[in-house]
Amino acid sequence: MKKTQTWIITCIYLQLLLFNPLVRTQGICRNRVTDDVKDVTKLVANLPKDYKITLKYVPGMDVLPSHCWISEMVEQLSVSLTDLLDKFSNISEGLSNYSIIDKLVKIVDDLVECMEEHSFENVKKSSKSPEPRLFTPEKFFGIFNRSIDAFKDLEMVAPKTSECVISSTLTPEKDSRVSVTKPFMLPPVAASSLRNDSSSSNRKASDSIEDSSLQWAAVALPAFFSLVIGFAFGALYWKKKQPNLTRTVENIQINEEDNEISMLQEKEREFQEV
């Protein structure tokens, strides 16, 4: 019986190990992002609208894949948030500006550490350092939120291109979160991709989705088949052991009956002797 229990426990651990790769595909740094990022809205409301925050904006956020800029962008966000933290006094109130910024700094620092552990080999950084720019709180934390969203889905998947060049001549795209100070000077890869029509872009997007689905299937199918095989072996093992267990129970019952008969015979002999 103990051997059967040990075998069942072994099967459970085996299935956990088989499904472990599925957990790893959900974003390499996803667990570093806490619910404290939701306080960004409160922080933006507390800061003056015309307040300026210095940030060395990493070009390429709007034209290159996230793995091309996320590592350097999070480092610059850490520097800017730390500098912003130093400008506020340490207030004990739970939702004070200092408290919120301090939590955001910890999140960003954890992301920096995570990216150091999971570096992308195909990213070739620009030789020029990003130039510092001034952003309003709304635009600055718009960049922050965009970087956090990129981390939630970031996976260690090798990009198709051999390298992605981050050009220092690129500037933020003009939208509700980021302003433009200079025209775009796109790197060769990005420029050639933007020359394609909308149908080509849609095809690339669909190809990306298909590639992601294939990568997921490549991990899920082996784990699924391993799970089925594991349960099949478990069923065979149980069927093999079941007759043995039945015979063991029958033998025990027979031995008990024999013992009772022997005891009765012995008592009968003792009674006859008396």
Curated annotation (Swiss-Prot):
Residue list for modification Pyrrolidone carboxylic acid: Q26
The membrane-spanning stretches of this chain are 216-238
Record text on subunit structure and interactions: Homodimer, non-covalently linked. Heterotetramer with KIT, binding two KIT molecules; thereby mediates KIT dimerization and subsequent activation by autophosphorylation.
Q: Which gene encodes it?
A: KITLG
InterPro entries per the UniProt record, alphabetical: 4_helix_cytokine-like_core, SCF
Extracellular compartment residues: 26-215
Q: Where in the cell is it found?
A: Cytoplasm; Cytoplasm, Cytoskeleton; Cell membrane; Cell projection, Lamellipodium
Q: What is this protein called?
A: Kit ligand
Ranges of the Cytoplasmic topological domain: 239-274
Q: Which GO terms describe its molecular function?
A: cytokine activity; growth factor activity; stem cell factor receptor binding
Q: Which PANTHER family match?
A: KIT LIGAND
Report keywords, A-Z. Answer: Cell adhesion, Cell membrane, Cell projection, Cytoplasm, Cytoskeleton, Disulfide bond, Glycoprotein, Growth factor, Membrane, Pyrrolidone carboxylic acid, Secreted, Signal, Transmembrane, Transmembrane helix
Disulfide bridge partners, by residue number: C29-C114, C68-C164
Role, per record: Ligand for the receptor-type protein-tyrosine kinase KIT. Plays an essential role in the regulation of cell survival and proliferation, hematopoiesis, stem cell maintenance, gametogenesis, mast cell development, migration and function, and in melanogenesis. KITLG/SCF binding can activate several signaling pathways. Promotes phosphorylation of PIK3R1, the regulatory subunit of phosphatidylinositol 3-kinase, and subsequent activation of the kinase AKT1. KITLG/SCF and KIT also transmit signals via GRB2 and activation of RAS, RAF1 and the MAP kinases MAPK1/ERK2 and/or MAPK3/ERK1.
- One GO CC term on file: extracellular region
The membrane topology of this protein is: Single-pass type I membrane protein
